[in-house]
């Protein structure tokens, strides 16, 4: 620890810290633009100037390391004059367009100019003007406002792992650009909007829509992947205006994937707002009571063993739990959350979780990806891995044909035999696994989505056992889930498989990706919020609330339960999920024993310990899985996905459709250059 004096007070701080960090620790307010705690230091805005005794000039505190005995002053006349001068230079070419700038009201330059500026203007020459750059359908640019802090460049390089933004020219001619002015090839590009301290980079879908003070803020959870990123839903009246990240150091830090951030406009289109019944081959709008009576009559006419329920990819735990209780009361145990027929082992909870945890990745020194596309399945997790790789703290190897993950990977091949050789210790990489202190394996849908998934998983468990990856001080076995509701469904006992043969009544709770050809003879009830495949195949449609219109628990891939709060009202005549299921039970004269959301959560916490620990990770058991299934000779490969359209909300998002089109155009442009 190093002792130093700041404004007359002595503090201690760890060696290697900067003067800026010491000042913040001492409770001092230091203005800054280029500095960001999660980015490399640039030191080019000069706004954080402080006075250090024995130094002839003010010093940029963000770039100066502390040393023993330093005496620092943060509020002297020299410091004040220096900051006023820096602010004056920053404003020389900055346009006075705050009234039409989307950053107005939440702009660092506005705030700091008011607090630290002179309040007068001595510059009477012409301001420079810069042509706006194209960065895709998500980011709107106004580069004349840019103050060259280079935050966006550093985020692209260090966090996103794409070297597609940089600065050209020098001095007053410097410009930040994407070089070829293409759509940015990143799943987390929207974070550049958040870290831009001025209005140079703004959200294109949100442009000219609202001001910060008009919005209501609601804490929620991103449901478009299984990471459980913490989000803030900003709404006005009953319309969602934008979605921003909330800080959670254990999960998403302060970053957010583009899909979770921008696909909210999908909540406006193709919504189900009234119940429907199929009559003479056509869906006809009916009352809720008629829909419930039709369901009651049909359920009473079907044997319990012929009834099945399938939960979709963005359904809350409470809704699944209510549906499970209803089916059990009817005498059926045929319910699943696995509409994709994934081969998932549920022997113990640790067998289907990301046990290392998202933040735990930063402790690993060797990572093996098997059939996993972390970049598109879990962009925030992938960013953490990439940062560790780029500083040389983590080595990543891969089995399976894969995509560019934005960091260096050593490919071992795509043959099943590689896993077999690792399991018996004859592979050339055996030594590296033995020497690694904290090795980890990430198993993706390229394994559990195979027909022989159980056999491959059994083989991977042998590798885990061989190199002692699951022990008291380290859990290195990880399943990379790609849907928000899977872990929660498995936690409450939903099955991993379902028998479609002989089903006479199928209850689809937001499920749109099942093989509908196997349900041709079944009566289908669809409870959901979008008119997608499930609704089009249904005999009865029950319009439900989306995740933004009801409160619900979601368990992320590492097994952490979190609550998504209700932000806006339901659309039309739609109802919340648990209310619909409760009313069906009422028509059937079945007592579920829970009348409201609070009672559902109390019962969940009593029956499953994990739900008594919201926002926490519980200790989980892991057991070696053995399968006698036969291995196929098919190569291992991560399943191809359309990242921007993976559920009913993102599929109905105009913004996501524009992203798909823009990335296809980018591929065509690249093909023209190389072919």
Curated annotation (Swiss-Prot):
One Gene Ontology cellular component term attached to this UniProt record is:
membrane
SUPFAM superfamilies, sorted: 2Fe-2S ferredoxin-like (SSF54292), 4Fe-4S ferredoxins (SSF54862), Formate dehydrogenase/DMSO reductase, domains 1-3 (SSF53706)
Q: Which residues bind [4Fe-4S] cluster 2?
A: 146, 149, 152, 196
Binding site residues for [4Fe-4S] cluster 1: 94, 98, 101, 107
**Which EC class is the enzyme in?**
translocase
Q: Which reaction does it catalyse?
A: a quinone + NADH + 5 H(+)(in) = a quinol + NAD(+) + 4 H(+)(out)
Q: Which GO molecular function, any one, fits this protein according to its record?
A: metal ion binding
Cofactor(s) recorded for this entry are: [2Fe-2S] cluster; [4Fe-4S] cluster
Question: Domain named 2Fe-2S ferredoxin-type: which ranges?
Answer: 1-78
Q: What is its EC number?
A: 7.1.1.-
**Keyword Repressor part of the UniProt annotation:** no
Cofactor note as given: Binds 1 [2Fe-2S] cluster per subunit. Binds 2 [4Fe-4S] clusters per subunit.
* Membrane-crossing segments per the record: none
UniProt signal peptide: none
- For the keyword Iron-sulfur, the answer is yes
Q: Which residues form the 4Fe-4S Mo/W bis-MGD-type domain?
A: 215-271
Give the keywords, sorted: 2Fe-2S, 4Fe-4S, Iron, Iron-sulfur, Metal-binding, NAD, Quinone, Translocase
| GO biological-process terms attached to the record | ATP synthesis coupled electron transport
Cited function:
NDH-1 shuttles electrons from NADH, via FMN and iron-sulfur (Fe-S) centers, to quinones in the respiratory chain. Couples the redox reaction to proton translocation (for every two electrons transferred, four hydrogen ions are translocated across the cytoplasmic membrane), and thus conserves the redox energy in a proton gradient.
What NCBIfam families does this protein's entry cite? Answer: NuoG (TIGR01973)
Q: Can you name this protein? A: NADH-quinone oxidoreductase subunit G
Q: Which organism is it from?
A: Rickettsia prowazekii (strain Madrid E)
